Amino acid sequence: MGMPSMPELLVILAIVVLLFGAKKIPDLAKGLGSGIKNFKKAMKEDEESEVSVTKSEKIEEAPKNEKSASTPIQDTTKQA
């Protein structure tokens, strides 16, 4: 059971035309295309928001690292 051959694809296409009609098929294809376009757009926006969050986290961490490096070290040893 591999890929359908050309005659099988033609039979499937004929059944689709009979079920939906020739006028409805372009509308279905247009709806499918716009759905895919919206899905890709949402995926791209999600990736961009993750990148911006990561950049803002790095910017917030940078000043914290500078403060810890500049604080003096206290002597905590006990003298006898």
UniProtKB/Swiss-Prot annotation:
One Pfam short name: TatA_B_E
Query: Which stretches are tagged as biased composition: Polar residues?
Result: 68-80
Q: According to its UniProt record, where is this protein located?
A: Cell inner membrane
Alphabetically sorted, this entry's keywords are: Cell inner membrane, Cell membrane, Membrane, Protein transport, Translocation, Transmembrane, Transmembrane helix, Transport
Origin, by domain of life?
Answer: Bacteria
In its UniProt record, which GO terms are filed under biological process? Answer: protein transport by the Tat complex
Q: Which GO terms describe its cellular component?
A: TAT protein transport complex
One GO MF annotation is: protein transmembrane transporter activity
What parts of the sequence cross the membrane? 1-21
Annotated region Disordered: the residues are 43-80
The protein's role, per its UniProt record = Part of the twin-arginine translocation (Tat) system that transports large folded proteins containing a characteristic twin-arginine motif in their signal peptide across membranes. TatA could form the protein-conducting channel of the Tat system.
Q: Which HAMAP family match?
A: TatA_E
Q: What is this protein's name?
A: Sec-independent protein translocase protein TatA
- Gene that this polypeptide is encoded by: tatA
